């Protein structure tokens, strides 16, 4: 989709009460002019704020422009602090790039800086180590249950030989690799106690700004919080108020469903009534409960997480 097409779609969506936007991917900062797009979307009547989800590697270059464009919140994906595991899972960049991106986001004064970590049993992650990013800085770490998005057992050619087995382990979803939130919270809390940070306590104040489903906890004395998103063990479909517009112009009412409503042909035909019809159909057909065990054909990078 062109920026003009995205802008026209958001203008129509704003007429239905859409107020909050998130730019995601894939990697949104790989799209030339991402900050310009954010600025154009913020200028649309009715839009109140824009957030972005990124792998963080390009944030040192673009954080200033994004903040100036009106982006208020940033989520940074970081699943591990182990360099070898990071290389095997991400296949590009380095942990240092991401950490510099986190620093850049804080320096530019984004209202909320969050780190998203997908908890995967096969990765044997240092969960408490990741939460320590928020010990002295207002970084909010959220742990997300591993979900069946996409289905690919093919090992890309650029994976180092020593990392190929690990990539294969985490590229094809296996229910046994999903760590339920109750178990994960216990793991994080007990690790905090062993490290002298004390147990996790329910977060009754200082919760980060946002409109998502995370339940927040914190370690006493930490500036940041620890959130848990229970997409698998305790779905929150009845509270879901999100629609996803894919890069190829399809409106998706549920992350876990392959049901999509094309809007790009109508946008290119300047048929706003057809766009509205697709939007209304997507709203009507948001499922009461996702069927996450079925998986999806598209990858998260194609849908927008």
Which stretches of residues belong to each language-model region?
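A sequence-level detector of short linear motifs
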Residues: 225-227, 253
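Radical SAM enzyme [4Fe-4S]-AdoMet core and its adjacent flexible, acidic
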Residues: 84-87, 92-225
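Canonical Radical SAM [4Fe-4S] cluster-binding loop centered on the CxxxCxxC motif
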Residues: 1-3, 255
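Short loop/edge segments at beta-strand edges and connector loops
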Residues: 54, 205, 230
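Conserved G/P- and acidic residue-centered "switch" motifs that form tight phosphate/ATP-binding loops
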Residues: 27
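Flexible, glycine-rich phosphate/dinucleotide-binding loops
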Residues: 59, 122, 150, 235, ...
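Flexible mid-to-C-terminal extensions adjoining Fe-S/redox cofactors in radical SAM and related proteins
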Residues: 232-305
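Radical SAM/AdoMet-radical enzyme domain recognition
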Residues: 3-23, 31-144
């Amino acid at each position: 989709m062109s920026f003009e097409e995205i802008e026209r779609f958001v203008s129509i969506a704003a007429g239905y009460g859409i107020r909050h936007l998130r730019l995601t991917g894939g990697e949104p900062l790989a799209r030339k002019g991402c900050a310009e797009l954010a600025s154009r979307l913020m200028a649309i009547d009715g839009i109140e704020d824009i957030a972005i989800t990124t792998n963080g590697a390009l944030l040192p270059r673009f954080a200033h422009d994004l903040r100036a464009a009106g982006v208020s919140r940033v989520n940074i994906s970081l699943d591990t602090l182990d360099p070898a595991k990071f290389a095997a899972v991400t296949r590009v960049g380095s942990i240092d790039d991401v950490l510099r991106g986190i620093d850049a986001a804080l320096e530019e004064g984004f209202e909320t800086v969050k780190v998203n970590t997908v908890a995967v049993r096969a990765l044997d992650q240092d969960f408490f180590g990741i939460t320590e990013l928020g010990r002295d800085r207002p970084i909010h770490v959220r742990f997300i249950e591993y979900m069946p998005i996409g289905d690919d057992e093919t090992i890309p050619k650029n994976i180092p030989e020593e990392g190929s087995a690990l990539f294969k382990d985490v590229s094809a979803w296996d229910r046994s690799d999903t760590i339920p939130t109750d178990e994960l919270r216990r793991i994080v809390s007990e690790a905090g106690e062993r490290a002298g940070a004390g147990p996790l306590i329910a977060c009754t104040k200082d919760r980060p700004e946002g409109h998502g489903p995370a339940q927040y906890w914190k370690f006493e004395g930490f500036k940041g919080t620890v959130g848990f998103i229970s997409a698998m063990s305790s779905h929150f479909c009845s509270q879901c108020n999100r629609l996803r517009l894919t890069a190829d112009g399809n409106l998706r009412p549920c992350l876990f469903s392959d049901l999509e409503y094309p809007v790009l042909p109508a946008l290119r035909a300047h048929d706003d009534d057809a766009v509205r019809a697709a939007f209304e159909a997507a709203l009507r057909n948001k499922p009461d409960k996702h069927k996450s065990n079925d998986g999806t054909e598209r990858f998260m990078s194609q849908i927008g997480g």
